[in-house]
């Protein structure tokens, strides 16, 4: 929901006031549907060729296309399911991360990244985001995919940067990598060749530069990248 809560700071207070962050959205209501289909350029990468509102089935909510966002927060280096223990990244459902919690240092921690929804050459979907909210966990219990919409599915260990697997990780149409927003506000370019591991046996530990940057408090040393 971070994209939604940011609206008042983007001169979009009237739109924010039309959408309650604490209530389900009635997408059968034509007025509500028109609001959540609003295209917000600030939430789109300039290089994006994504159809907007979303046309990819994986980016729709209950089959309904609504406005896209290319930007998602990092939830850490592990799997995130609705009933999982607290993730170790900055953003996750009901997160309340404060600056003091990021003990690895703001310049050493991923906050946000980008993701395209355009299929790659292999035909796999890049699962993108919507800005208006999230789908409820109750719709598919214990399934972390339920929070991919507009929240935190920049999940380390899934397809890596610009990978060719099913796209839950960072992706873009930029040559060679993606842009990332660090916790200190700096924007950097993360190469698709960054030191990373896609080994399921190491998914819960910070075993590479990529993993360590996604975690806010593991105490691991991070070199140049």
What are these regions (language model features)?
Residues 1-225:
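Surface-exposed loop/linker segments characteristic of extracytoplasmic
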């Amino acid at each position: 929901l971070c994209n939604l809560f940011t609206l008042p700071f983007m001169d979009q207070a009237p739109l924010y006031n039309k959408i309650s962050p604490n209530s389900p959205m009635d997408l059968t209501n034509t007025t509500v549907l028109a609001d959540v289909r609003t295209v917000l350029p600030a939430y789109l990468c300039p290089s994006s060729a994504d159809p907007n509102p979303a046309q990819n089935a994986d980016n729709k909510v209950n089959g309904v296309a609504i406005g896209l966002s290319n930007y998602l927060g990092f939830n850490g280096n592990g799997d995130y399911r609705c009933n999982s223990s607290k993730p170790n990244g900055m953003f996750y459902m009901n997160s309340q991360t404060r600056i003091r919690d990021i003990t690895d240092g703001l310049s050493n921690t991923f906050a946000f990244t980008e993701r395209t929804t355009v299929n790659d050459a292999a035909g796999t979907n890049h699962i993108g985001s919507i800005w208006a909210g999230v789908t409820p966990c109750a719709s598919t219990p214990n399934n972390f995919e339920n929070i991919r919409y507009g929240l935190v599915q920049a999940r380390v260990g899934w397809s890596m940067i610009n990978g060719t697997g099913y796209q839950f990780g960072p992706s873009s149409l930029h040559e060679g990598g993606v842009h990332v927003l660090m916790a200190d506000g700096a924007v950097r370019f993360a190469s698709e060749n960054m030191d990373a591991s896609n080994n399921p046996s190491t998914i819960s530990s910070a075993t590479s530069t990529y993993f360590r940057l996604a975690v806010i408090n593991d105490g691991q040393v991070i070199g140049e990248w």
